[in-house]
């Protein structure tokens, strides 16, 4: 597991964890706790997450019912020789996607009117 943290334009910090497959030819990039969902906002956040999943092709948003948070996940396959380039690109795209989607998530929670 590799952990990286960056500041975005709308949210900071963005903590990313890279989970590499046992064959070292795939990776799952996960950003846990993008937003904490208060009681009574589950339906609103599920609608927002579904909308974001329909909009973003390579990122998956999901609501964790156990800890009441939203996670963003991106996966990629690669050859050993291009792992650095692919993981860097994945990280940049993930930061952009989270930055772009954060206002929608916060609006669903009633933080932005």
Describe each PLM feature range.
Residues 1-34:
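Ser/Thr-rich, low-complexity intrinsically disordered terminal regions
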Residues 13, 38, 81-83:
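Intrinsically disordered, low-complexity acidic/polar segments
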Residues 32-34, 75-77, 81:
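Short strand-loop junctions, especially beta-strand C-caps/beta-turns
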Residues 78-90:
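A short acidic/glycine-rich loop-to-helix N-cap element
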Residues 87, 95-100, 104-105:
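Long, contiguous binding/interaction regions
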Residues 106-113:
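Short, highly charged C-terminal tails/helix-capping segments
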